[in-house]
Every structure is written in structure tokens, then in C-alpha cells.
Design a protein with these regions (language model features):
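Acidic, Ser/Thr-rich low-complexity segments on the non-lumenal side of membrane proteins
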Residues: 2-34
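Tandem CBS (Bateman) regulatory domains
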Residues: 1-3, 16-21, 38-92, 97-123
């Protein structure tokens, strides 16, 4: 089981960029509410649309992508991969039946699965 962290919609863009994204070398994050419910995905590239002097007063919820249906635990890698491509994100949230974020699929984890399948199938 891998560690994953989320950010709060109330977090400032400055906190997301300087305290989450750059230290973790992760340019996107899943946004949740206080109960762990999925809210959206925030991207450093979208922070670039906001003047940097406003980063400390602009919330992640103001710039996050909200039009996503999070993945369920029963979904296949192919289903999640298609949604990631459609959304233009490198990460995708996975939620339980109550809508709480329980994990994150990354583009790198999908590459790892595909490479593993190729190796085990003699590809």
C-alpha cells in the first residue's frame, strides 16, 4: 500500500505549490473536503493562470477541475486510463462506496502495470 496525500479545497494555491507540489515533485493533487470526500483535482499548471501575488489568497477550490467522476475500486486499469486521458490529468482519484478518497492512480503506476504485463506475457 502506497502513501498518498490530498489537499483541502480551502488550502491556498501558495501552500499547494510550495508545500505540496514542489517538495513532492507532484504537479497535481486530489482535493478533498474535511471528511475525505472527493472534490476535484488541482494542477500547478492551472495555478499559473493566477497572478502569483494572489496565490496566498486564492483557494485550491477556486482553480480545481471539478467535472470528474472518481474511479471505483472495481474499475479496470483501462477504464481509469481512458478517464485520465479524457481529463488531461496524470493522477486519478479512487473512492469507496461512501465517496471518500481511498487511493490515487498515477500515470506512472499505469506504465508500471503495462510493463509488468508485457514482461509476464513475453512481450
Amino acid at each position: 500500500k502506497r502513501e498518498f496525500r490530498t489537499v483541502a479545497g480551502t488550502d491556498s494555491i501558495a501552500d499547494f505549490v510550495w508545500q505540496f507540489a514542489f517538495p513532492r515533485k507532484q504537479l497535481e493533487a486530489v482535493v478533498t473536503d474535511d471528511d475525505g470526500q472527493f472534490q476535484g483535482i488541482v494542477k500547478v499548471s492551472d495555478a499559473g493562470d493566477v497572478d502569483q501575488d494572489q496565490w496566498s489568497t486564492t483557494r485550491c477550490s477556486d482553480i480545481m477541475i471539478q467535472e470528474l467522476s472518481p474511479a471505483r475500486l472495481s474499475w479496470t486499469v483501462r477504464e481509469v486510463s481512458a478517464l485520465m486521458e479524457e481529463a488531461g490529468t496524470d493522477i486519478y482519484p479512487v473512492v469507496d462506496t461512501a465517496g471518500r478518497v481511498v487511493g490515487v492512480v498515477t500515470d506512472q503506476s499505469i506504465v508500471n502495470v503495462v510493463e509488468l504485463l508485457d514482461e509476464t506475457q513475453g512481450g
